[in-house]
């Protein structure tokens, strides 16, 4: 089966709420994480900033897993700009430069339908190629909060994961409740109005992935953790046949006790795959800490591992390759 991997980039103002996202060394730097992640997949290090995206504690972006899987299995990969502050300095498909707004102050994404329409055209074009399967990952700091807001609006009692070991769940809920008050709704009020849920609380990555998935007629693997559950829930509410979709994530998301990944996936009715990566024997603390609940997923890490496994590599091969890439980064840093 011919597969193509897409990584959809998105930004939301929610990532700059202090304490909500660790997908960047500071809240302000989360604005640069999506293009930097995209660039790292193609170059030895990002162009837009001189460092690889890290958490405030120095844990490397999960793009390192996607890059490792790709170096092993050599699958084709394209970057899609769903809506970001800055364009990545790699060839990419431009859907929009709209950024998700802070939904406590007003609707998050008035342009949702425009983004879906453009992304749908792209999905339709991909259907005219020999590609039979899309594996769609994302890089969207703050996106687990927008995902949880959308899931709640659609009536799911979901808790999303976090790139931090201590999931800022109470802060997320406080932000979401403020957004619901602003919109004058209760959880579940947009069950029959998925596009309204997306407009009020979503982000441009979600809108772009929904559009691509609506336009493409083959199999779609949503490569991500709890953020892709929100995409799946939107697609289901839009009456898509869920049998052509699956979610590929990592064991770290599935094992996250603070989130409801498996239960929410069952509620939506989508099958899941969890990449059994193991960094416990890594020589680098930044990677070993993935086993302690840091980072967990992103940039399609689980889906990329799944593609490598389909190509005959093991999760152990991917884990070893990640170590090698991290070593290369350390050597670059030293020069």
UniProtKB/Swiss-Prot annotation:
InterPro entries: Nict_dMeBzImd_PRibTrfase, Nict_dMeBzImd_PRibTrfase_arc, Nict_dMeBzImd_PRibTrfase_sf
Pfam families: DBI_PRT
Gene Ontology MF: a single term: nicotinate-nucleotide-dimethylbenzimidazole phosphoribosyltransferase activity
Family membership: Belongs to the UPF0284 family.
Protein name as annotated: UPF0284 protein TON_0688
Organism: Thermococcus onnurineus (strain NA1)
Lineage, top ranks: Archaea, Methanobacteriati, Methanobacteriota, Thermococci, Thermococcales
């Amino acid at each position: 089966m011919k597969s193509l991997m897409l990584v959809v980039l998105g930004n939301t103002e929610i990532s700059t709420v202090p304490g909500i996202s660790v997908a960047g060394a500071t809240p302000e730097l989360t604005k640069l994480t999506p293009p930097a992640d995209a660039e790292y997949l193609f170059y030895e290090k990002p162009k837009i900033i001189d460092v690889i995206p890290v958490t405030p504690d120095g844990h490397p972006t999960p793009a390192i897993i996607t890059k490792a899987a790709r170096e092993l299995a050599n699958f084709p990969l394209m970057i899609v700009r769903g809506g970001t502050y800055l364009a990545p300095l790699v060839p990419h498909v431009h859907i929009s430069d709209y950024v998700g707004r802070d939904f406590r102050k007003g609707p998050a994404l008035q342009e949702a339908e425009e983004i879906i329409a453009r992304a749908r055209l792209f999905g339709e074009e991909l259907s005219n190629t020999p590609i039979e399967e899309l594996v769609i990952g994302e890089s969207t700091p703050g996106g687990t909060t927008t995902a949880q807001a959308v899931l709640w609006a659609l009536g799911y009692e979901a808790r999303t994961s976090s790139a931090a070991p201590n999931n800022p769940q109470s802060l997320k809920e406080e932000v979401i409740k403020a957004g619901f008050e602003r919109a004058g709704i209760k959880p579940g009020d947009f069950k029959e109005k998925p596009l309204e849920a997306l407009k009020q609380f979503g982000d441009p990555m979600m809108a772009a992935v929904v559009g691509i998935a609506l336009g493409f007629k083959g199999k779609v693997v949503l490569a991500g953790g709890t953020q892709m559950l929100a995409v799946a829930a939107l697609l289901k509410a839009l009456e898509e046949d869920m049998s052509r979709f699956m979610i590929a994530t990592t064991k770290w998301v599935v094992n996250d006790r603070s989130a409801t990944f498996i239960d929410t996936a069952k509620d939506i009715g989508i099958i899941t795959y969890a990449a059994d990566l193991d960094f416990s024997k890594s020589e680098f603390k930044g990677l070993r800490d993935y086993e302690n609940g840091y980072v967990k997923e992103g940039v399609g890490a689980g889906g990329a591992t799944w593609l490598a496994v389909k190509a005959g590599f093991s999760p152990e091969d991917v884990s070893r390759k990640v170590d090698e890439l991290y070593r290369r980064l350390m050597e670059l840093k030293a020069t």
